[in-house]
Amino acid sequence: MLDATTFDELRIGLATADDIRRWSYGEVKKPETINYRTLKPEKDGLFGEQIFGPSRDWECSCGKYKRVRFKGIVCERCGVEVTKSSVRRERMGHIELAAPVTHIWYFKGVPSRLGYLLDMAPKDLEKVIYFAAYMVIDVDEEGRHADMPGLENELRLESKTLSDQRDARVAERLQRLETDLAALEEEGAKADQKRRVKDTAEKEMGQLRKSFDEDIARLERVWESFRTLKVGDLKPEDADFNELLDRFGLYFEAFMGAEAIKRRLQAFDLNQEAELLREQIATGKGQKKIRAIKRLRVVSSFLATGNSPAAMVLDVVPVIPPELRPMVQLDGGRFATSDLNDLYRRVINRNNRLRRLLDLGAPEIIVNNEKRMLQEAVDALFDNGRRGRPVTGTGNRALKSLSDMLKGKQGRFRQNLLGKRVDYSGRSVIIVGPQLKLHQCGLPKQMALELFKPFVIKRLIDLSHAQNIKAAKRMVERSRPQVWDVLEEIIRERPVLLNRAPTLHRLGIQAFEPQLVEGKAIQLHPLVCAAFNADFDGDQMAVHLPLSVEAQAEARILMLASNNILKPSDGRPVTLPSQDMIIGLHHLTTVREGAEGEGRAFASVSEAIMAKDQGSLHLNATIKIRLDNYVPSDAADTGTEPVTAVVETTLGRALFNEALPVDYPYVEAVADKGQISAIVNALAERYPKVEVAAALDRIKDAGFYWGTRSGVTVSLSDILTPPNKPQIVAGYEKKAAKINSEFEKGLTTDLERRQELVKIWTEATNEVAEAMSANFPADNTINRMVTSGARGNWLQVRNIAGMRGLVNNPKGEIIPRPIISSYREGLSVAEYFIATHGARKGLADTALRTADSGYLTRRLVDVSQDVIIREDDCGTTKGLDLPIATVDAEGVLTRDPNVENSVFARTLAADAVGTDGTVVAKAGEDVGDVLIDKLVAAGVVDIKVRSVLTCESAVGVCAACYGRSLATGKLVDIGEAVGIIAAQSIGEPGTQLTMRTFHTGGSASADDITQGLPRVQELFEARTPKGASPIAEAAGRIVIEETDKSRKVILTPDNGDEPHVYPVLKRSTLLVEDRQQVELGQQLIVGTVDPKEVLRVKGVREVQKHLVGGVQGVYRSQGVPIHDKHIEVIVRQMLRKVTVVDHGDTDLLPGELVDRSRYNEINRGALQEGKKTASARQEVMGITKASLATESWLSAASFQETTRVLTQAAMEGKSDPLIGLKENVIIGKLIPAGTGLSRYRNVSVEATEEAKAERYPNRIFADDSAFSENDLSFVDFDSFSSDDYTPGTYN
């Protein structure tokens, strides 16, 4: 088999008949599969052992040769080669077709490649291929030209003869009529009798004339048709054509079916056609030019690859190996088989029948019908259902063809190549493990034993607990006590990976050191739950084992939970204490007025603890304590030395501060969610990861400990309804009644009434909510939960204890009658009914949103998967100017609110100069929190920073333009797959975005504004929004023209160009006034603008701003922080292609989409050779289109439209350079990112002397007990084999 590591490119091409015969090990001649009595494969059948190899290892079919010693012998009795049965997975066969057939992908795909090549409409092609019309293949021009006069004379003569004959026959009939009439006259017949005879005669003469005229006309038609006959003409099978064939069959050839296409293709001159097309493109206009460009693309791809176009017509069909289309016996003796076998059988049956008919010399019409059926059978095999009704099996189910095997989520690409199942893995339910350290997880003993089984077996043999593998296996299965000891020893320091599906971002897989636990559930550290989005209501997680030493090192260094404290999307900590921990710390750090022991002073924390244990001091009483390592809370940096001081605080706060690092400033505040979040933020910024993890564990332990002791419970008596609620509601009921009566009198419209009522009841709800929260005492548990941020919010409490308020109906409008009851009081039936509407819609919405968001993530990953950090610095001087400060009302500079997610963690592109002209920061410096504060203090308003949008790396991006990795807080490493991180960061919060299209004011009068997830999709797909606003094409003056039906905005440019007219709907809101001066690109009406227009009018930078700003707007509105750089990575991919407008003297085709880097490279080459360069226009592509336009055909095929991508790639003979990640996953190579980059793969390590000394300690002076059987910790077991080692001796 192919070894994935030995090749650098993968090419796909068109297989010729010779290629297929070369792959094949024999021809499949019979449609039989296996003999149902002997269950042996039939000879020459679809499973034949002679062709595909033996079905049992080292055993021929008849049983003459058995055993491996006959390897390679071909049995002379049955003709089967003695070899391994696995060859049945790789050996192919073939079917020799009795008539050629076209490949359906090239004929029926959109656009039809065959149609483009032969310049025929697909409808006409279909007529020829399926035997409804003849196609002229060849015309003997010279012969026809030479014989034309003679033939014409002959024809004229014949036509003259015919007309003479006609006249003679008519005259003869007339003569007879006269004779008849004379005879009747003599007999004295009546007038009507005469008339009858006359009519009959006239009718006969008419028929005579008609039949002769038809013959003459046919001659004319045939002659005309022969005179204008050219290659490629279609002729229906009728009398005219038969006549043409009889008379002039020597001068031309016409065929039906794939035979016709094949002959045309064989005679096709690609070079000449390419010349013609280039000429057409140069001179043509409009549709003609577009079609010529498309055709040239097909023609030039055949020229470039050297493929023969005739390979699109098949003479041989390959048969895939039988193990890939298996046939298995079910329990009842029936057989289950792959659909492919049925499809192959139809092909073989029809092929054999056609052969027999040809041998018998059957009439043409029968043979053609059989040929058509063969064509249809091969079509169904390749792509069932592409043309006509699909072939169905039992139960009217369409059979799965070869194309269906590749397509879609269940196809080969996505199911087996990108999503393999892996060994050394297990899954189980998770439970919380509060006793664990941040880098640990609890692994059930049984599960660990199963996972580490091979390692345990090896160690048991090494320690001579067992003599051989079988014995060791038996020991493991019987769980002997020694096994557990060995397992403990092995598991030490070996990380395992835990994963929770759905893995929405890279923190969904993290490494932990396993601790063996009893029971069957995996124990998870509470702080990593947020990253996994896990809870303990029955979630399951999977465990995977990194096997190789490199994998273990990577898991430990890169994936250990304690090294993944920051979120890659915004650089903020993800391991924030939550719920119980917060309530515990809140309980610990509150101050209680007048509590036991207030005002006392203590010499140390220990003394205060003793007082508390004696019961003379309350945890929350204000006291004075002498603290040894005190850093004042206003200390700016970590540099401040700790001092000894007497501090006024509470015992609880002193205990809380003991959980923080020694030199951390003393926290003198209530530890609610915000405070803890700020502390963890500061820890992550200032301390090394080891210390942060330790501090987090201490905070967690303190939180759980005091959370338990706080005794926080919820009972019905804690839910306090405000006593004045009835009075508040009654007051507003009066107001509402007044408005209703005004409406009944006809003073207001229904709309006004609704709006007023909504306003009134919103006020009422707010007033009840305020009364309710004022009514809660400070020590009420619900109040403590909400104010500390542990769980819930005031809205939920209002629903339970205040009033439910207004709700929406399914249309999204607000029902003007509120729900006055709270859940504590209970809802009436009517109230309950209207409340269910909104709630149910919410659930349905969430389900849809999850699917939508998942699909968005998939597209984002696909478009950005090959964006990898490839170099340190691309050397560009370009960058983006971004604001870092805003001027507030008093004229003071403050930090811009969006600084965190725009300039933070980037690299300066130019020196930042303060107001006094001094350089505050040099170009190339990293912009962190400290530097931002320094810049703002120096009066800098905006700075120029590097960005991936302006990066000039040819492949991937450079580290300097990307800036700091948000997950580590350091400059990004080379090999970091920033594209995938960007896709995950944008996709992961996708489920939190709303799905709604907001109706402004509850009525559909104004244009709906798309927001939430649909808006993000619209931006990333670069779609033209519904009701897009026009933008000013030039700077100029506006005139607004209104008629009673329509409204126009007319823009007169300042530079004297033609005025631009924009028709505008009457109901849309204008953003410009009459006679106003506008800038280039200014928006004219309220609504969203089309990114393609922005690009055309204002250029690349503006469209980048528009896309990044638009996506950020949606996420900010939902309070989801994402750094701009992630969105920029995606936008960079959307803008990387240009469309060639004029190809100059280069090899580019006009209208071709090329990568900007490749386009620049080609132009540079042309300049150096002094040729005319190409010109192009920038494109903005949606992410789906951009993914399909990738250089890698493997990646594109595994994304969407598999058959179309493969058809195109095979025709162009595309080579996949295997640069991206997906392609390498598919073929099973290490991905070229992270440690898979060649610069990391080829590193050689030199051990230092200290390391050697540590690894191989000098044992000469050790006491002899060091050589006892069990302590072999200094033996390097990885490189040790048990053959040259006997326990008890060490050589």
Curated annotation (Swiss-Prot):
Chain residues that bind Zn(2+) 2: C874, C951, C958, C961
Residue positions binding Mg(2+): D535, D537, D539
Entry's cofactor comment: Binds 1 Mg(2+) ion per subunit.
One GO cellular component term: DNA-directed RNA polymerase complex
CDD domains, A to Z: RNAP_beta'_C, RNAP_beta'_N
Pfam (any one): RNA_pol_Rpb1_5
Classification via InterPro entries: DNA-dir_RpoC_beta_prime, DNA-dir_RpoC_beta_prime_bact, RNA_pol_asu, RNA_pol_N, RNA_pol_Rpb1_1, RNA_pol_Rpb1_3, RNA_pol_Rpb1_3_sf, RNA_pol_Rpb1_4
One GO term of the biological process aspect: DNA-templated transcription
GO terms for MF: DNA binding; DNA-directed RNA polymerase activity; magnesium ion binding; zinc ion binding
Enzymatic reactions: RNA(n) + a ribonucleoside 5'-triphosphate = RNA(n+1) + diphosphate
E.C. numbers: 2.7.7.6
Residues at which Zn(2+) 1 binds: C60, C62, C75, C78
Alphabetical UniProt keywords: DNA-directed RNA polymerase, Magnesium, Metal-binding, Nucleotidyltransferase, Transcription, Transferase, Zinc
Cofactor(s) listed: Mg(2+); Zn(2+)
Protein's job: DNA-dependent RNA polymerase catalyzes the transcription of DNA into RNA using the four ribonucleoside triphosphates as substrates.
Family: Belongs to the RNA polymerase beta' chain family.
Quaternary structure and interacting proteins, as annotated: The RNAP catalytic core consists of 2 alpha, 1 beta, 1 beta' and 1 omega subunit. When a sigma factor is associated with the core the holoenzyme is formed, which can initiate transcription.
Name the UniProt record assigns to this protein: DNA-directed RNA polymerase subunit beta'
Taxonomic source organism: Leifsonia xyli subsp. xyli (strain CTCB07)
Lineage, broadest ranks: Bacteria, Bacillati, Actinomycetota, Actinomycetes, Micrococcales
